[in-house]
Amino acid sequence: MSTEQSVTEKQETQVGFGSALGTGSLLMTLAGIAFIGYGIIFLVLNFIGGGFELGVSHLAGQTPADLDPTVAYYISHLHVATAGFIISTGIAVTALSWFGVRRRQLWAWTTAVVVAVSGLIIALPMHYMGGFAHDWVTHLGPIYLAVIVFVVGVVLAYKGL
């Protein structure tokens, strides 16, 4: 009689939050929720904020109110789209982490990592090319904090898969 669990039984076993997998998947989930929160703040500030976006109050000495209304609207519509994609990424990471990674689904772990990393690899380099001044603590700080939580979660979860 074998005492080892089959793959299906192992996947269905409840993951304890003291385990590497449990803690890792929880941290990945919390990071996904943080991505959603950042996207919501990004979206709301588009409509009620005084600057261009979080941590960017002016560009070349101008505020959005100084711009031609058509240009300001165009920038606004790009911010809404960006916020939508940040929120969507957060939803994907949250769902994959909570419902897939926690159940030892390697495909869910891989997809959550690819979704988050691809978005960050595309978005972050532009912030360091010197095209505009921004307060990096308020502009990127929340995302960096969420990324640190995510990476710790990714490593812990992988150890438990």
What do the predicted segments below correspond to?
Residues 2-161:
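Topology signature of small-to-medium multi-pass alpha-helical membrane proteins
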